[in-house]
Amino acid sequence: MEDAIERLAEHVVNTNLSDIPNKAIQSAKTYVLDTIGVGLAGSTGPYVKELLNTYSLPSLPQVTSRVLGQNVKLNPADAALINGFQIHNSEFDCVHEEAVIHTMTVLLAVIFADADRRGGISGSKLLESAVLGVDVACNLGVACSS
């Protein structure tokens, strides 16, 4: 008998963009654009320069990933951290109230950094990743708060 985690993993692995309802795809497009917008706005927010100064060390390996609104590339983990900070620092990022999670902040910061590391991804793969990530994160959040 498979457990809930196995079912969740199978759902993610076996779901393609064509399986996702159009309404979810349209919502994802809106939320991706919104998240990019608040991330760019947050690029001039408090403590961003301090974070960039801390994480912009030239000796770090795998400097491949861009930071929103900044003329800098960092290793993927650091770029994801700073992008997430910038997206969230003005508190205009979207939140799933029931799951109590800022899903797009966490997911897109990582998706963008990983896409740069890989040399890019298609828009459809970005949307598929975002929709499935939101699905997993929100369901786990709701399960934990129930």
Model region roles, listed by residue range:
Residues 1-146:
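N-terminal core-entry segment
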